[in-house]
């Protein structure tokens, strides 16, 4: 006599076999629409990129099911033998990629990586010295609205008014005056190389820890196409997306064993619990991709494309902060066209070109208005755009923004429609996840 199926067998089978398209059409619809947006819009947000199918596979794997508080070999849960393998691989690849001795791959974001460093190496009320947000710095470097600006006494250096390069004389003066616990180099909208040796010399003069936040340019460092923060930095933080082309997350690197020990404790149990093992797997895959020779070819193209884009914009009457770029991004000063960043971002969005409004040094406009836009080449380069395509993108941007300059905020509808069609056609020539 055959036994009846166990209660719940059918529903259990559906649970493990049904895709989101079947179980949650609202979410599936939003995902599909976002895929369509990414497929048919020119992505110029400098902090965004497009991951490989392999990274997507790892980040969407069964590793999401596993809790793994602690570190490889020292977990607070059983059954971690395979996620230990994943995290060890991620750590080893990160150390090889950046030629350093220690790596913590658990931070869930660049912000949490920075918070972890502060938690490890400073006390509330200590002074930190970083690049002003108004000059291209980052919120987590002591902006008043950020936790870093609430917990610490934040002092900020600027760029020079004429060149828009970091004013190292001011850095030294402020360091000597305020004796910061931590000096920070790096930012979110600074398009030039940074003199890490000069920063370290100042840090040594005042007994400060030197932190480099290379979230934006980590891929360029990994490829060996701009100078590495090591051996100058005591500690380095980064995101794992942006130019590294991995999943969204953070990482902390150092060559100092004592700092590494403090960092590990600061991340867990200090500010995080169980790490996101599926994301760490995605990081490991991305690091492996970045260790291949073709990654250097990719990053060189990223840099060439950013320069080409900037040159076309200058030819069409725009100004570039610092006069150009050494990296993956250009910061465009819109004042020669009498435009604001808000108007430019909206108009370009209508034409299927995605970017973000951004303040420029000594910006007369409010932070939610701005006098600039920030443009980056990583995502477009990932999908295959070369110099010719970025030159065309520069011309398309110019056409749209000239329409806004002439006609006001609503722009030139006919021009925007024509540019949108060209943007879609360009993207169709270089499809993603085809």
Curated annotation (Swiss-Prot):
Which GO terms fall under molecular function for this chain's record?
glycine hydroxymethyltransferase activity; pyridoxal phosphate binding
The record's InterPro entries line, in alphabetical order, gives: PyrdxlP-dep_Trfase, PyrdxlP-dep_Trfase_major, PyrdxlP-dep_Trfase_small, Ser_HO-MeTrfase, Ser_HO-MeTrfase-like, Ser_HO-MeTrfase_PLP_BS, SHMT-like_dom
* Metabolic or biological pathway: One-carbon metabolism; tetrahydrofolate interconversion; Amino-acid biosynthesis; glycine biosynthesis; glycine from L-serine: step 1/1
The cellular component terms of Gene Ontology attached to this UniProt record, alphabetical and capped at eight, are: cytosol
Q: Which GO terms describe its biological process?
A: glycine biosynthetic process from serine; tetrahydrofolate interconversion
**Residues binding (6S)-5,6,7,8-tetrahydrofolate, per UniProt:** 133, 137-139
- Fetch the Gene3D superfamilies from UniProt: Aspartate Aminotransferase, domain 1 (3.90.1150.10), Type I PLP-dependent aspartate aminotransferase-like (Major domain) (3.40.640.10)
Describe its assembly: Homodimer.
The similarity annotation says: Belongs to the SHMT family.
Please give the name of this protein.
Answer: Serine hydroxymethyltransferase
- The species is Hyphomicrobium methylovorum
Gene transcribed to yield this protein: glyA
